[in-house]
Amino acid sequence: MKNIIFPKTLKKGDQIAIISPAGFVEEASLQSTINLIKSKGYQPILGKYTLGKFENGYNYSGTEKERIQDVNWAFNNPEISAIWASRGGYGCQHLLRHLKLSEFRENPKWYIGYSDNTVIQSY
């Protein structure tokens, strides 16, 4: 049986990446999340495509390539201590085959998300 490796406890000043691996999110809707993160003493860092929009029968936050770029950036950036998914929706399952987790497995971090994001959490 493998040992479970838990992420480090967050401390004030840590950076939390905010990404949108599924649905599109309005900037105004994200402001309360940004304010909460700041109020706890953390630094919110938005992914390049967090506020993007790509319509393809569903309002994604970006193309599959753009969304996976943000996810892999957040997972593998050593300066990021936690990842906050801006919303659920649809589309995370399409990203699984593109996840690059080698660095993440050596330095795990908290992944905060619900709905469609649980497929990434369980991967």
Protein language model regions, located:
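ATP/NTP phosphate-donor binding region
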Residues: 1-79
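Active-site histidine-anchored catalytic micro-motif
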Residues: 59-123
